[in-house]
């Protein structure tokens, strides 16, 4: 018998799939990544082919073994983390999807969400699920598929169809149809799950006419769900033992195990998630209440706020405005800015997220003078990411009544020292960058490793953690208050501009 000295994380994202093998110290031993196609059948629609996702996952599992030289039988357990909300419906008998998967960003089910609001279900759905009614979540996507794919409703009523988010789909495929499960964190993003009773909500299922026979069984985030079929894992039957949606996996990977701990992942957008402990905190400001993770018989809840534009603002400087050639260059240029921070960029390219929720707003720039330079503009764009993060974190503080002593950060833009220092300054709290920016995959690996006894408990995980770089606030209070006041005025001004064409005869 080979010694089982490794765990594998499968990180199934929106544009690519990755497999990463970690050793007992949480060090990366090998990895593989593969992109897969995105489909945009109509404006605002985003779809994936679930078989292409499965194909990419098979490919990266092989790639990780090849790169690391590790054999499949040396893997103690597999953890899965995934793009959340993306919806697959497949035929129970053939295992074939009935249509493309509808991706979390896709707006094709917006009319269904709008109708639910018109019919007065907002309060009921918020109280039960912790979510706002939106096409973002899986519920309206399932309804859309049942409405638009011929014969789907009838098949669903006859118990012939299964629904799952990507985690469910991958477990079903890896076990060759033996296991149909999901976990608390993914279930809490469907808008069908009662986060208080920890069960699928019959009232919401009836409202949307979704048969409960389609739904996966909901399990904790760290337990053995089933074993890979040997022919799907290169000859080995390995326990699949951890699962969590990507943002919750990052929370766990950042070891935010205590109430009040908070992390910000700076990706294309930025996702801020706060551990609120064993009681769900419903937000008065349209932040999302969600399940962080459930482990050892306990469930930990979280508040989540998202910013639509973070890393994509830096891409805009590079690709749209051509002010920089590479993303890291934004830091060099911003460091050379000479102005008094009088320029404000409000990157509302697709509207404003929490806590403004203004989908009609568009980007704006304020405070330009004849002396404004490219460097000032780049710095203002970076600062906008930090201002938006402060908007969300201040709202979380207000909603939860929990003091926030430290912000843990990860994701691509967290590599930018200037941005992280400004984030600490504007929040007036310490900001700690993860030593290992692979926090999402690491979170999935930890959950799986704990379930199979690879690691003993949370204390052992904490003892392995490397301390990342700490950024401490250095800005005087008066300067901080004035800068943030300017940001709030810039956002207010942005929201007043809504272009309407002049009507005939005006």
Curated annotation (Swiss-Prot):
Q: Name one Pfam family in it.
A: FGGY_C
Q: Please provide the record's keywords in A-Z order.
A: ATP-binding, Glycerol metabolism, Kinase, Nucleotide-binding, Phosphoprotein, Transferase
Question: Matching NCBIfam families, A to Z?
Answer: glycerol_kin, PRK00047.1
| Metabolic or biological pathway, per its Swiss-Prot or TrEMBL entry | Polyol metabolism; glycerol degradation via glycerol kinase pathway; sn-glycerol 3-phosphate from glycerol: step 1/1
Outcome when changing residue 232 to E:
Loss of phosphorylation, 2.5-fold reduced activity
Residues that, per the record, bind sn-glycerol 3-phosphate: 14, 84-85, 136, 246
Give the protein's recorded name.
Glycerol kinase
Protein activity control: Activated by phosphorylation and inhibited by fructose 1,6-bisphosphate (FBP).
Gene Ontology CC terms, in alphabetical order: cytosol
Listed GO MF terms: ATP binding; glycerol kinase activity
Could you tell me the Gene Ontology terms of the biological process aspect for this record?
Answer: glycerol catabolic process; glycerol metabolic process; glycerol-3-phosphate metabolic process
Q: Is Transferase given among the entry's keywords? A: yes
Residues binding glycerol, per UniProt: 84-85, 136, 246-247
Give the multimer and partner information: Homotetramer and homodimer (in equilibrium).
The protein's PTM annotation reads: The phosphoenolpyruvate-dependent sugar phosphotransferase system (PTS), including enzyme I, and histidine-containing protein (HPr) are required for the phosphorylation of His-232, which leads to the activation of the enzyme.
Q: For ATP, which residues are the binding ones?
A: 14-16, 268, 311, 315, 412
Report the catalytic activity: glycerol + ATP = sn-glycerol 3-phosphate + ADP + H(+)
| Entries under InterPro entries matching the protein | ATPase_NBD, Carb_kinase_FGGY, Carb_kinase_FGGY_CS, FGGY_C, FGGY_N, Glycerol_kin
């Amino acid at each position: 018998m080979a010694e089982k000295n490794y765990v594998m994380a499968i990180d199934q994202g929106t544009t690519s799939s990755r497999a990463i093998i970690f050793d007992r110290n949480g060090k990366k031993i090998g990895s593989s990544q593969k992109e897969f196609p995105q489909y945009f059948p109509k404006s605002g629609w985003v779809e994936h082919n679930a078989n292409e996702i499965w194909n990419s996952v098979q490919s990266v599992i092989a790639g990780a073994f090849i790169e690391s030289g590790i054999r499949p039988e040396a893997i103690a357990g597999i953890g899965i983390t995934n793009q959340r909300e993306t919806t697959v419906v497949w035929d129970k008998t053939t295992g074939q999807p009935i249509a493309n998967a509808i991706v979390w960003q896709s707006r094709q089910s917006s009319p269904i969400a709008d109708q639910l609001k018109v019919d007065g279900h907002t309060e009921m759905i918020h109280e039960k699920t912790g979510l706002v009614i939106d096409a973002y979540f899986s519920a309206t996507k399932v309804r859309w598929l049942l409405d638009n794919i011929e014969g789907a409703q009838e098949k669903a009523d006859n118990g012939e169809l299964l629904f799952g988010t990507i985690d469910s789909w991958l477990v079903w495929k890896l076990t060759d149809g033996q296991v149909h499960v999901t976990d608390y964190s993914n279930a809490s993003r469907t808008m069908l799950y009662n986060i208080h009773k920890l069960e699928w909500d019959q009232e919401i299922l009836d409202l949307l006419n979704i048969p409960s026979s389609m739904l996966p069984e909901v399990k904790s985030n760290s337990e053995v769900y089933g074993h890979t079929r040997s022919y799907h894992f290169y000859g080995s039957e390995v326990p699949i033992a951890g699962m969590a949606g990507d943002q919750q996996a990052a929370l766990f990977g950042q070891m935010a195990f205590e109430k009040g701990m908070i992390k910000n992942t700076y990706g294309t957008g930025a996702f801020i998630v706060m551990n609120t402990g064993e009681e769900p905190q419903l937000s008065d400001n349209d932040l999302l209440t969600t399940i962080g993770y459930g482990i050892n018989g306990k469930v930990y809840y979280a508040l989540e706020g998202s910013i639509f534009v973070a890393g994509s603002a830096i891409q805009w400087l590079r690709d749209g405005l051509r002010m920089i050639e590479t993303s890291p260059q934004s830091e060099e240029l911003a460091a050379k800015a000479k102005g008094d921070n009088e320029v404000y960029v409000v990157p509302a390219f697709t509207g404003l997220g929490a806590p403004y929720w203004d989908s009609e707003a568009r980007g704006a720039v304020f405070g330009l003078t004849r002396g404004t330079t490219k460097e000032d503009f780049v710095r203002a764009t970076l600062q906008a990411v930090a201002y938006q993060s402060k908007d969300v974190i201040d709202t979380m503080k207000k909603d939860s009544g929990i003091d926030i002593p430290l912000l843990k950060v990860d994701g691509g833009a967290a590599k930018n020292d200037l941005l992280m220092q400004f984030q600490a300054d504007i929040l007036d709290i310490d900001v700690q960058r993860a030593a290992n920016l692979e926090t999402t995959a690491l979170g999935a690996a930890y959950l799986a490793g704990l379930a199979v006894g690879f690691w003993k408990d949370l204390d052992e995980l904490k003892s392995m953690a490397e301390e990342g770089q700490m950024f401490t606030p250095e800005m005087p209070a008066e300067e901080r208050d004035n800068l943030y006041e300017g940001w709030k005025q810039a956002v207010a001004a942005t929201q007043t501009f809504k272009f309407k064409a002049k009507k005939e005869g005006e």
